[in-house]
Amino acid sequence: MASQKPHLNLITIGHVDHGKSTLVGRLLYEHGEIPAHIIEEYRKEAEQKGKATFEFAWVMDRFKEERERGVTIDLAHRKFETDKYYFTLIDAPGHRDFVKNMITGTSQADAAILVISAREGEGVMEQTREHAFLARTLGVPQMVVAINKMDATSPPYSEKRYNEVKADAEKLLRSIGFKDISFVPISGYKGDNVTKPSPNMPWYKGPTLLQALDAFKVPEKPINKPLRIPVEDVYSITGIGTVPVGRVETGVLKPGDKVIFLPADKQGDVKSIEMHHEPLQQAEPGDNIGFNVRGIAKNDIKRGDVCGHLDTPPTVVKAFTAQIIVLNHPSVIAPGYKPVFHVHTAQVACRIDEIVKTLNPKDGTTLKEKPDFIKNGDVAIVKVIPDKPLVIEKVSEIPQLGRFAVRDMGQTVAAGQCIDLEKR
């Protein structure tokens, strides 16, 4: 039986090499989720490969390719319990070209740990900003900042360096709209302040990282909204049948339900539901599930389709109006521009058909009607036409399916939310 404690999806974000995977490995190890002999095995292997401090990180970096490169590519999920919560940990990649995965991952998070290295010359960096901003735009409501590598400051465990990094991070996070933020000085590699108070930082009187996680609030589950499950993957399992996998964003799914997948437009009956290999009689928002559907073949549906009930089907649009912020475009964006929109698990090329107006980012008032173009830092209302059918919802109705990121040339050029739509 799955744990009776409230369940939170927790993502670790931050700049590459600031120690996210090592911290996650440490958390899981100290919770007994990983036996000591496995860590010892990883330590020997890491030493042989010339990556002596990587053993904890390798817990999450399951893929061989990641071990060789020392970077996290796909999203790895692991679970652990605290006194108060049952957490599924999502370790998000830090390298630039992996921001896409980070986007699809962040939209599943109830809370985030932002990892920032306190080592000299590290601190708040470009990727720290981008990840924090994406977390905000994609609706991650609460965050704890782990100021990591305190063992590597000069002198080690320097209160002065902690306060510098904390001040920079606080300024950044407040400017993008985070309110409740706690800061914890830690060493993921040495274990300081992760689950136990550190004797090396007597100047710090606050909670350990674990206590800070337990101070998170449980987001109210949107169980009264229509069912929406964006499909992450589809399996065909011998003797069972077609099994889509995804996270319930809104609503409730039970065995026996009649469901429809859109835009694929395929219907079926739910036979059974599983989470972490255990059967569920009811799946609720936040649950990462696999569910067996009768009447649908594996090739009928794919990643990016959304499952809903027949009487309240997901909304397929032919056009939508969005509020976007331009984050990182090398020149300007004009009508006719066609990047890829990442909405829940879907990735669809969309044309920016019209720039309706630009807004003042501080108060949302109109700056200019129908400008010719928009550039970095601009907030704008735009009309968007997808190349092919796409499920997206108004952010005012189902925010979980109303937010998106815009990618082009290997980077996130903009992020935004759907404020109005034209049904197909």
Curated annotation (Swiss-Prot):
The subcellular localization recorded is: Cytoplasm
Keyword set includes Membrane: no
Q: Which family does it belong to?
A: Belongs to the TRAFAC class translation factor GTPase superfamily. Classic translation factor GTPase family. EF-Tu/EF-1A subfamily.
Stretch list, region G5: 187-189
Renumbered to this chain, region (G3) spans 91-94
> What reaction does this catalyse?
GTP + H2O = GDP + phosphate + H(+)
Name the UniProt record assigns to this protein: Elongation factor 1-alpha
Question: Binding of Mg(2+): at which residues?
Answer: S21
Q: What is the lineage of its organism?
A: Archaea, Methanobacteriati, Thermoplasmatota, Thermoplasmata, Thermoplasmatales
| Segments for region (G1) | 14-21
Function summary: GTP hydrolase that promotes the GTP-dependent binding of aminoacyl-tRNA to the A-site of ribosomes during protein biosynthesis.
Which gene is transcribed and translated to give this protein? tuf
Say which species the protein is native to. Thermoplasma acidophilum (strain ATCC 25905 / DSM 1728 / JCM 9062 / NBRC 15155 / AMRC-C165)
Residues holding GTP: 14-21, 91-95, 148-151
**Pfam families this protein is in?**
GTP-eEF1A_C, GTP_EFTU, GTP_EFTU_D2
| Residues of the tr-type G domain | 5-223
Q: Which residues are the signal sequence here?
A: none
Q: Which InterPro entries match?
A: EFTu-like_2, G_TR_CS, GTP-eEF1A_C, P-loop_NTPase, Small_GTP-bd, T_Tr_GTP-bd_dom, TRAFAC_GTPase_members, Transl_B-barrel_sf
Source domain of life: Archaea
Q: Which PROSITE patterns match?
A: G_TR_1, G_TR_2
Per UniProt, which keywords does this protein have?
Cytoplasm, Elongation factor, GTP-binding, Hydrolase, Magnesium, Metal-binding, Nucleotide-binding, Protein biosynthesis
